[in-house]
Curated annotation (Swiss-Prot):
Main location: cytoplasm
Organism from which the protein derives: Dehalococcoides mccartyi (strain ATCC BAA-2100 / JCM 16839 / KCTC 5957 / BAV1)
Gene3D superfamilies: Anticodon-binding domain (3.40.50.800), Bira Bifunctional Protein, Domain 2 (3.30.930.10)
Cross-referenced InterPro entries: aa-tRNA-synth_II, aa-tRNA-synth_II/BPL/LPL, Anticodon-bd, Anticodon-bd_dom_sf, His-tRNA-ligase, HisRS-like_core, HisRS/HisZ, HisRS_anticodon
Gene that encodes the chain: hisS
Name this polypeptide is given: Histidine--tRNA ligase
EC number: 6.1.1.21
One Pfam assignment: HGTP_anticodon
Assembly information from the UniProt record: Homodimer.
Keywords: Aminoacyl-tRNA synthetase, ATP-binding, Cytoplasm, Ligase, Nucleotide-binding, Protein biosynthesis
One MF annotation (Gene Ontology) recorded for this entry: histidine-tRNA ligase activity
Length: 418
């Protein structure tokens, strides 16, 4: 028997209320802050991610699903959402729009990762990107938007971690100092971190291995190497967050995993016991648009994993309202009533009344059992005798009462009762 591929999951009907709830609140918060939805293809030119995410990153070197199609084009299933949005921004001339251009997405993401709780090889992200504004107040607004999104969902006990990793002018000095420090401790590092020493030095700070974390504890801090412009930007961001009453913790080891980040980086974590560690994060990518062939354009974004959000909702006992389902079951008795009930079901649905119905000949007792198992409150019973009289039986399943209702009044009566 076939099963879903490793690292993927089926989203069954009982989980759909969570997904509907998260998507609904995502669209709501996006509208509040003026973001418009943009959907990009599931696959892109592989070069887009090599160029934007960075050849030395784990995503590009280990985690991308890349294939060659029959035309010889090298394509990659989308491993993150920002680069495709930036590609669409350039391709469709959005740089002529009023700045900042605010876009959001709800997308499937694909990474060949080790499956674990809240982490899948195909997962889903909600992300928003603001392109064309350099001021740190935008950074603060995006962080507030992310924070408010979680609050809307009921996840309120949160921790915000913040750092600035500088720009292309000052970051090389910091990376040089970091490399010098780590080279003195190379013997204490895991094999992956020894590789990162030359290829992706900033990621040394992010290693979760105990021996590497011990070395990272005394590593140089990016804040000590910021140029005057980056320092002023970071100071203004902290000032704006304070005005917004958003508590933050400066984490000088926070770097994020993508090469395109600059200046602001942040992560949000729920503090509830047993919660998934990081549920969302983001930062600035002021050089990415230029890197993809556009003009130098500042930008800032955020993304959050929907599976991780739902895991935290369940752990905190937050249960969304169930999705609407039919409150009426339509039963019939007899061949003539069978055809009439089929037409009646169509009329009821056109009037906005959700209906369950039976399709094959069953006894009325079996149909009522089916209605009871579906949890409906009302059953409409149509038989040969009722058809002759131009009426139907409307039965209350909770109170076991029933009444004959003329067919031309049935829709109004059902709407009145439900």
């Amino acid at each position: 028997m076939y099963q879903s591929p490793r690292g993927t999951e089926d989203i069954l009907p009982e989980d759909q209320p969570y997904w509907h709830f998260v998507r609904q609140q995502a669209a709501r918060i996006a509208a509040l802050y003026g973001y418009q939805r943009t959907d990009t293809p599931v696959f892109e030119d592989a070069g887009l991610f090599v160029r934007s995410v960075g050849e030395g990153t784990d995503i590009v070197s280990k985690e991308m699903y890349t294939f060659e199609d029959r035309g010889g084009d090298k394509l990659t299933l989308r491993p993150e959402g920002t680069a495709p949005v930036c590609r669409a921004y350039l391709e469709h001339g959005m740089q002529t729009r009023t700045k900042p251009v605010k876009l959001y997405y709800l997308s499937s993401i694909f990474r060949y990762d080790r499956p674990q709780a809240g982490r899948y090889r195909q997962h889903h992200q909600f992300g928003f990107e603001a392109i064309g504004e350099a001021d740190a107040s935008l950074d603060a607004e995006i962080i507030e938007m992310a924070w408010s999104f979680y609050n809307l969902l009921g996840i309120t006990d949160l921790s915000l971690e913040l750092n600035s990793i500088g720009c292309r002018q000052c970051r090389p000095n910091y990376i040089s100092a970091l490399k010098d420090y780590y080279q003195q401790h190379a013997g204490k590092l895991c094999p992956d971190c020894n590789t990162r020493l030359d290829k992706n030095t900033l990621r040394l700070l992010d290693c979760k291995r105990a021996e590497c974390q011990a070395v990272a504890g005394n590593a140089p801090r990016s804040a000590d190497y910021l140029c005057p412009d980056c320092l002023a930007h970071y100071s203004r961001l902290k000032e704006c967050l304070t005005i917004l009453d958003l508590p933050f913790h400066e984490n000088f080891r926070l770097v994020r995993g993508l090469d395109y980040y600059s200046r602001t980086v942040f992560e949000i974590q729920p503090m509830a016991e047993g919660a998934q560690s990081t549920i969302g994060g983001g930062g600035r990518y002021d050089g990415l648009i230029e890197q993809l062939g556009g003009e130098a354009t500042p930008a800032m974004g955020f993304a959050t994993g929907i599976e991780r959000i739902i895991l935290n909702l369940k752990r905190q006992g937050i249960v969304p309202s169930p999705l609407p389902s039919p409150a009426v079951f339509l039963a019939y008795m007899g061949e003539t009533a069978s055809l009439a009930s089929f037409a009646l079901a169509s009329d009821l649905r056109k009037a906005g009344i959700g209906i369950y119905q039976t399709y094959a000949q069953k006894s009325i007792k079996a149909q009522l059992r089916q209605a009871n198992s579906l949890g409906v409150d009302w059953v409409v019973i149509l038989g040969e005798e009722e058809l002759k009289q131009g009426c139907a039986v409307l039965r209350n399943m909770k109170e076991a009462g029933q009444a004959n209702i003329p067919l031309d009044q049935l829709i109004c009566e059902i709407k009145k009762q439900i």
